[in-house]
Curated annotation (Swiss-Prot):
First-level EC class: transferase
Binding-site list for orotate: 118, 146
Pathway annotation: Pyrimidine metabolism; UMP biosynthesis via de novo pathway; UMP from orotate: step 1/2
Protein name: Orotate phosphoribosyltransferase
Entry-linked NCBIfam families: pyrE_Therm
Source species taxonomy: Bacteria, Bacillati, Bacillota, Clostridia, Eubacteriales
Cofactor field: Mg(2+)
Length: 190
């Protein structure tokens, strides 16, 4: 798929939002990628995740895992495309954990996936959970990298769409200074 084809899917589904947003990282931005609006369409989910999976075909991946909430559908669809298990990690007492009977066997090659990264914090937390379980993080795949490639996860990282989106610390946010309320569209702490 070309970048233009991927952008067209995000535009068609209304997933590229403009306004004043408080991101999961705590930073503020005037742009937000609401991947749930894309992922609600099974055909688009399959298409995008199949493209992401293709970038890791032949890498010996045996498990795909993503953080709840944004990584659940991505994990499932990428795992389906690779013909492997798809798991998700959840926060328990503030720590990303494997729950619901999920496990990773020592030495399994694991692909960590997510819908959107800005700072990479959630992906790093999942990577740590994988390593604590004895798995080997073989790579990371994301639908959208808001850092435009600036985030270094320490493993090969593939993004379907990279975008340089300005974000601000809350104290430096021009929208806050104008008194414009921030919207928190993500899933953390709901």
């Amino acid at each position: 798929m070309t970048r233009d084809e991927i952008v067209a899917i995000f535009q068609k589904t209304g997933a590229m939002l403009s306004g004043h947003f408080r991101l999961t990282s705590g930073r503020h931005s005037n742009r937000y990628f609401q991947c749930a609006l894309v992922l609600q369409h099974p055909d688009y989910s399959e298409l995008l995740c199949r493209e992401l999976a293709a970038r890791f075909a032949g890498d010996g991946i045996s498990v795909v895992i993503g953080p709840a909430m944004g990584g659940i559908i991505v994990s499932y669809e990428v795992a389906r495309a690779l013909g492997v298990r798809g798991l998700f990690a959840e926060r328990e007492n503030g720590v990303m954990t494997l729950r619901r009977g999920f496990s990773i066997e020592p030495g399994e090659r694991v692909l960590v996936v997510e819908d959107v990264i800005t700072t990479g914090g959630s992906v790093r937390e999942v990577m740590e959970a994988v390593r604590k379980s004895g798995g080997t993080v073989a790579g990371a795949g994301v639908l959208v990298d808001r850092s435009n490639g600036a985030v270094d996860l320490g493993v090969r990282t593939e993004a379907l769409l990279t975008a340089e989106v300005v974000s601000y610390a809350p104290e430096d946010c021009p929208f806050c200074k104008q008194g414009i309320p921030a919207v928190k569209p993500g899933s953390r702490k709901i």
